[in-house]
From Swiss-Prot:
GO terms for molecular function: metal ion binding; ubiquinol-cytochrome-c reductase activity. Gene3D superfamilies: Cytochrome Bc1 Complex, Chain C (1.20.810.10). GO terms for biological process: mitochondrial electron transport, ubiquinol to cytochrome c. Belongs to the cytochrome b family. The cytochrome bc1 complex contains 11 subunits: 3 respiratory subunits (MT-CYB, CYC1 and UQCRFS1), 2 core proteins (UQCRC1 and UQCRC2) and 6 low-molecular weight proteins (UQCRH/QCR6, UQCRB/QCR7, UQCRQ/QCR8, UQCR10/QCR9, UQCR11/QCR10 and a cleavage product of UQCRFS1). This cytochrome bc1 complex then forms a dimer. The chain crosses the membrane at residues 33-53, 77-98, 113-133, 178-198, 226-246, 288-308, 320-340, 347-367. Heme b b566 binds at residues 97, 196. Component of the ubiquinol-cytochrome c reductase complex (complex III or cytochrome b-c1 complex) that is part of the mitochondrial respiratory chain. The b-c1 complex mediates electron transfer from ubiquinol to cytochrome c. Contributes to the generation of a proton gradient across the mitochondrial membrane that is then used for ATP synthesis. InterPro entries: Cyt_b/b6_C (IPR005798), Cyt_b/b6_C_sf (IPR036150), Cyt_b/b6_N (IPR005797), Cytb/b6-like_sf (IPR027387), Cytochrome_b (IPR030689), Cytochrome_b_C_euk/bac (IPR048260), Cytochrome_b_N_euk/bac (IPR048259), Di-haem_cyt_TM (IPR016174). The keyword Cytoplasm does not apply. This is Cytochrome b. One of its GO terms (cellular component) is mitochondrial inner membrane. Binds 2 heme b groups non-covalently. It comes from Perognathus merriami.
Length: 379
């Protein structure tokens, strides 16, 4: 008798993706983040769904509806904090996942990598719009500042901003459409994640050595299914520690003040996971230049496959490139710190140097290091 999972049209798809999938025998814990991102997305969709049952996207009642969720709805406070901190967890996993991709040369699977970049943009857009919904001070002013950046686009800029706002300022129409987009985008992200997985399974997973593993494959289940399960348990333990003990550690106190268009907060800043890009934006003393640098800071990921000069795929045996990779990580941490600081000396110059270094490492130093390492292997 044939096994049902191998013949049933639906189960066959699941079987090929999660059960009988041939996987390299040596992939490490860094390969867990794909499944962890899936867990994060499910948490966000479920908590978001329950929040939307009680939330009202209206400037007059949005703030009080969030307050009502936290005070009056059964476990509303838990759902709200899970959703807010779930976003942070999502980005932690996302950045580690991208870092893994850069370190081990996974970007050489170009289709998978490019869909990953689109996914990153979608997740960033979703998170930004979600931050606007509680209609606190930082929600309102964050929305005003970030949407206003589009006015730097020549000719169509000002009209484009008013079109997005649905008026002459961030108001009821803006909040309403942001809620609509914030609700629909996670489902688009889920669909894109399926495409991401589809392209990955065309080639099979990369591995830490960056070499072909066709001769040494093991079935995904039970080996990696249990490994992913362990990762998920560890992730949830970390997640609930933050949610239950430090729920406001990653948020901004200004967002507990209702939005007031007549009172600007002293320091307008986005959530921590956007601070590196915000620092790059602010490091250029020109509006259009800053916006271009902001977009390029993420879009530069698309250049990784083109700038790969080494004969080896992974950084496993490339000490110069390894040093540059960790310099890049340190640089991003410095940019994150600078993004949360006021625009005054010495933070301005630190931000400018860190921004220049960020682009230099990716566009210049890493490709040169690859060529040097090729020469070293010949000697």
């Amino acid at each position: 008798m044939t096994i049902m999972r191998k013949t049933h049209p639906l189960m066959k798809m699941v079987n090929h993706a999660f059960i009988d999938l041939p996987a390299p025998s040596n992939i490490s814990g860094w390969w867990n983040f794909g499944s962890l991102l899936g867990v994060c997305l499910i948490i966000q969709i479920l908590t978001g769904l329950f929040l939307s049952m009680h939330y009202t996207p209206d400037t007059m009642t949005a703030f009080s509806s969030v307050s009502h969720i936290c005070r009056d709805v059964n476990y509303g406070w838990l759902i709200r904090y899970m959703h807010a901190n779930g976003a942070s967890l999502f980005f932690i996993c996302l950045y580690l996942h991208i870092g893994r991709g850069i370190y081990y040369g996974s970007y050489m699977y170009k289709e998978t990598w490019n869909i990953g970049i689109i996914l990153l943009f979608l997740v960033m857009a979703t998170a930004f719009m979600g931050y606007v919904l509680p209609w606190g001070q930082m929600s309102f002013w964050g929305a005003t500042v970030i949407t206003n950046l589009l006015s730097a686009i020549p000719y169509i800029g000002p009209s484009l901003v008013e079109w997005i706002w649905g008026g002459f300022s961030v108001d009821k129409a803006t909040l309403n459409r942001f809620f609509a987009f914030h609700f629909i985008l996670p489902f688009i992200i889920a669909a894109m994640a399926m495409v991401h997985l589809l392209f990955l399974h065309e080639t099979g997973s990369n591995n830490p050595l960056g070499i072909l593993s066709h001769s040494d494959k093991i079935p995904f289940h039970p080996y990696y299914s249990y490994k992913d399960l362990l990762g998920g348990v560890a992730l949830l333990a970390f997640f609930f520690t933050i949610v239950l003990f430090f729920p406001d550690a990653l948020g901004d106190p200004d967002n507990y003040t209702p939005a007031n268009p007549l009172n600007t907060p002293p320091h307008i800043k986005p959530e921590w996971y956007f601070l590196f890009a915000y620092a790059i934006l602010r490091s250029i003393p020109n509006k259009l230049g800053g916006v271009i640098a902001l977009v390029l800071s993420i879009l530069i990921l698309a250049l990784f496959p083109l700038l790969h000069t080494s004969n080896q795929r992974s950084l496993m045996f490339r000490p110069i490139s390894q040093a540059l990779f960790w310099l890049l990580v340190s640089d991003l941490l410095i940019l994150t710190w600078i993004g949360g600081q006021p625009v005054e000396p010495p933070f301005i110059i630190i931000g400018q140097i860190a921004s220049l270094l960020y682009f230099s490492i990716i566009l210049l130093f890493l490709p040169i290091a690859g060529m040097i390492e090729n020469k070293m292997l010949k000697w």
